[in-house]
């Protein structure tokens, strides 16, 4: 298709997108199928796709205090959670398509995932494979948001899509607490940082700003939202260097 906005994308998925409705369900089979179908809708247009998974449905590094363990150890557990999520997504994608899917991990776990090697990841993309990146960058104190921005730059992605669960984009206040909260349609990187908007890790936005990586923050629960973004439609919030702060109608 010649009217595509992007040719290569990184999509950052939260662990919450995979989670069942019960607090005891780390995964939901219907949600996994839905995620796979949404990703494949993009892939089927000829777009190269990289996925980065969060691990919050299994374990969060910021729960270290609750578990009375050091933050570094908690982050290590969280990295393992992202590997589990990546393997579940791989299985779902392979069930719904004939595409080859590769899980690449920043920590060694070679029985189930390839090590992340940039040149190998680029080779996979050239061959038309789907790539799922897990275990962050292999270091504690680094969020998966930052990982997503770094990997998007390493793999020469045209943009980063940040898929949120139940949130339509960036708001000027918490829409769950403030009925008058307004959604931004577009933002410059500096607008996001100066206004201390907290839907995404600021270090990731700063890295994107330094290298002019466009960011789309959108509600993944909205069917075909990611595909429509790739077709040029205004969905969610778009963040870049050459956009002005505007609210949605």
Swiss-Prot record:
- How does its activity get regulated? Inhibited by UTP.
> Record's Gene Ontology CC terms?
cytoplasm
What domain of life?
Bacteria
Annotated GO molecular function terms are: ATP binding; UMP kinase activity
What the entry lists under Gene3D superfamilies is as follows: Acetylglutamate kinase-like
Q: InterPro entries this protein is in? A: AceGlu_kinase-like_sf (IPR036393), Asp/Glu/Uridylate_kinase (IPR001048), Uridylate_kinase (IPR011817), Uridylate_kinase_bac (IPR015963)
- Where can this protein be found? Cytoplasm
Keywords annotated in UniProt: ATP-binding, Cytoplasm, Kinase, Nucleotide-binding, Pyrimidine biosynthesis, Transferase
User: What EC number(s) are associated with this protein in UniProt?
Assistant: 2.7.4.22
The record's CDD domains line, in alphabetical order, gives: AAK_UMPK-PyrH-Ec (cd04254)
Q: Where does UMP bind?
A: 55, 75, 137-144
Family designation: Belongs to the UMP kinase family.
Functionally, this protein is described as follows: Catalyzes the reversible phosphorylation of UMP to UDP.
Q: Could you give the subunit structure recorded for this chain?
A: Homohexamer.
Q: What is this protein called?
A: Uridylate kinase
Q: Which organism is it from?
A: Orientia tsutsugamushi (strain Boryong) (Rickettsia tsutsugamushi)
State the gene name recorded for this protein.
pyrH
